[in-house]
Amino acid sequence: SGEQISVGVLAQNRQGVFFQYADDYLQQFGNLSPFTLQSSIQVQAAPKQPHQGVHGVFGDCLPDGWGMLLQDRIFRQKGILPNQLTAMDRLAFVGDKGMGALSFSPVSEFSATTHADIDLATLGLEAQTLFDSSMSDYMDDNHDELDGHTQQVLAALVAGGSSGGARPKAQIYMPAGETQHCRTFAQPGDEAWLIKFTSKNLALGHEEGLCEAVYLQMTEVAKCQPPQWQLIEAPPTSGASAWLALKRFDYVTEQADLGSKRSAGRLHMHSACGL
């Protein structure tokens, strides 16, 4: 419905990370992760592995390779090295921009709040540039300085949110049927899409998206109900003929009227690994 509900509290000390459900939540809703969390208000310690010291359901909200690259860029510009960060720092950075229904507050002061309309071609080309630079050891001091335009696009990519995987991608919002212009924030009636860009440094180069599209066609034939998808024409300078776009299954476009505020809803998402 888009209504925000307090699920509980995450806390960290020298012993590790702990979670406690809010009593009001348990009286109304089910367990977020029934295999690893108990449906009680007792404090529950997270295992050290395999989810960076947090419970699996929250580990699902952490960024993967591409999201980590973007976060690390931002933190380095603030003088913070990746080895100084904890999973809790990264969850605070994700805030309400991750996949699924969970959000985290307070939000990190370093988290991007850019609300911008941006050309999809520009976003994809700059994402490709950032990804390719990471392949040539971007951590070298000589590679950390970005020009103003690339800096703006980096902020837009980060503002778009966090998602799994190592490939360059962006979470964007756009009206149904309009792919040429997109934005990093939702407007009423927008659809949420995940756009997967390409790079010469990927295993299948600029054909990664085309290959995945074939797999999606196969899953449709097999009646596996894949998410809605489309191929979007890529600019010639990208080296790709098309980029793959996947409609986010966790984002409910239908809106509920919450007093004076209308809000899109989210579906809870939990991976098999996180379980």
Task: Give the positions of each predicted feature.
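Phosphate/dinucleotide-binding and metal-coordinating scaffold of catalytic cores
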Residues: 1-275
